[in-house]
Amino acid sequence: MTNRPTDFWNTDLPELLGGLAANANGLTQTEAEARLERYGRNLLDTTNRRSSIRQYLAHFKNPLVLILLVASGLSALMGEVEGAWIIWSIVLLSVTLDFFQEHRAEHAANLLKKQVAVRATVLRNGQPVEIRLEKIVPGDIVLLNAGALVPADCRLLDAKDFFVNQSVLTGETFPVEKHATSLTEATHEFSEADNAVFMGTSVVSGIATALVCSTGERTALGDIAETLTRQPPPTRFELGLQSFGQLIMRLTIFLVLFVFLINAVFQRPLLESFLFSIALAVGLTPELLPMIVTLTLSRGAIRLSKKHVIVKKLSAIEDLGGMDVLCTDKTGTLTEARIRLERHVNALGEDSAEVLRLAYLNSCFESGLRSPLDDAILDHHELDAPIAAENWTKVDEVPFDFERRRVSVLITRQGQRQLIVKGAPEDVLKHCTQWQAGDDIRPLTDDDRQRIKRLHHQLGSQGFKVLGIAWRNVPSTHDHAVIDDETELTFAGFAGFLDPPKQSAAAAIKTLTASGVSVRILTGDSEEVTRYVCNLIGMPVSGVLLGRDVSAMDDASLAARIRDVNLFCRINPAEKKRIILAFKQLGHTVGYLGDGINDAPSLHAADVGISVDTAVDVAREAADLILLEQDLNVICRGVSEGRRTTTNIMKYIMMGTSSNFGNMFSMAAATLFLPFLPLLPAQVLLNNLLYDLSEFPIPMDNVDSETLQKPQHWDIGFIRNFMWTAGPVSSLFDFMTFGVMLWVFKANEALFHTGWFVESLATQVLAIFIIRTAGSAWKSRPNPWLAATSIGVVLLTCLIPFTPLASALGFEPLPPLFFAILAGMVLSYLILLEIVKRLFYRHMAKQST
């Protein structure tokens, strides 16, 4: 059988095993490696990965770069060979530096992602081993359980209470039960193949052993990948980049057309004017921005990895820096997630070994995703497990789901059949008609219900997480358990669990709150338990909403109600998602921390989906960030790093839209009164290249502690206002330079070009020391590398007119007096820019209050 999408579910199992040369013990490691070479990696290549050479060449696809290369080629054909070579060399150097930095950054980020890649358990040499999904091959035997992602198209060999979510393929969100049996009727529709599971689907409950039949692009998912592939909605950061790009493009088009038309009116050489216009466009275009963004984000990802946070989606770092609401469960964040069974009481509140026995039998035979509560029951020190389960065997099960909030197992012993139900107390109690008092079974009156509810609340107020336990006998011929069996139950009692509060939680919540991040608890626990834990750690409760309240509200009412609520109790997964979307509707940047099987929708809905490395596969796959330890302090450190990363990206953007824009505007305006071009095209490109070189260390720059104390949001309005404020300051000193060169030095064309080239680059580059901080430039220390490259580029610029390259570039040596004037002008420019910056931030602060 070949590895392609076939109706393998219709094939007899012995024939299928024979065709794949497989058996129930799995493949040998040697055979698996040979098949990996033969079939290729188990990947959907929808990303169209490119070789390094193609990635490098893609940098030349920038329309402005292409126009520049073509135009300079025409210039060479007309005899301007030297100028053309200079332009080509500068473009080549700029593109090469850009590619090298971006490629290295992406490589580092991809290495980090591999640390948290989803893995699968397969049989190799007869033993279960964990391998990366991409190494699975046809013929492998895969072990599947609740929470796992199905790694390939597989035929089931064995399945027990096995339910799968196939919505990625069918759009149907309700779980489908699968069986390890032959189909009674052949079908060509994979949605009707009840004995097969498919790549990309997820296991909701149960366990199974499966034979891999198709991998990678030959799976059902791979066959329709192009129709399924949808770009995720852009993040706030990505939308901000798009808006910024549109702003720059509009300015660039206006200035380029203006300059070209002015030169045409003055009857200057058209080709040279065209080259100058395009060079001006290159100078205005922040072509280094993609590299700066990638490099800054990847460096942020590397720093986050050292703080136990692995980044799967780079743009999520910026959203982490802007996060102002964090939604999280109580368990593992406010508590230690070390759950112990402390109480097992009957309906009268008395300790009961019978309640413990029933709870044990339910947890022992449950085959779905075993919760920490099940583990606590099975590990309980008072329990004699062999005696408790003696001679009992399982018949069937109704798996847990978040609508019923309970799980039932049907067991049998010596002709007796019993259904044992365990779940949320209120959901168990409402299906009971009797209660157990020792050996007596009594009718459940309204007074009994109220007494049992009071007992439940009493346990909750003492910090116990409570499960209700009930049972009923069924006929010995009853072979299948269904939801309708969960009626006329006998209430046995409660199992009470304690999860000690996490000592670090209080300090972490205070740190997050002081940093502008509001922590909201979304839990399935009762209000009493959640309040108890919050009181222990000193977390004030500002408001409470229950799941039933959330479900009764429409979206608008929910958004209006949640502003001051920080506890959401008895919440199911659908309600969690609605709460997250409501916070987003209010304009918040929302993070969600989840690790459960039904947390994927909420992780997708949040701006920042956060999970832990011990989470189920579906949660880890849906998350943007993976925590290597479940601790709010890790998120505190992550938020700080996200803000640092965002701030450094903003520094480059604000540099490009202030001093750089001011210089390019001056260049355009100078064409109105100069009898020659303000700078030659090659000089404009060299100016741009040297400026870019000075900006390379921005991703490593230090960030003021004050900046790290508040969310850093992308704000295109802020950028635009800063451009119109700081840009004219740069232009003012450019025009002063024009006056000095024309009236003091009586400069010819070459000397004018040289003087303004040096001054424009000096002011443009050194402005970073002012713009990089919202506070005092004299008190904020830049990264040494940034300081060194900035000063180094300015010194290099001053030396270029005295090098052998000067004549080729159209420069000539400057008189000593020029440098004295330059020093005074640069100092004056930086002082004025600092004053204007402070006034700008003061004005913006008043507007925001």
Please annotate each region the language model reported.
Residues 163, 169-170, 180-184, 336-358, ...:
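Basic, amphipathic juxtamembrane/active-site segments
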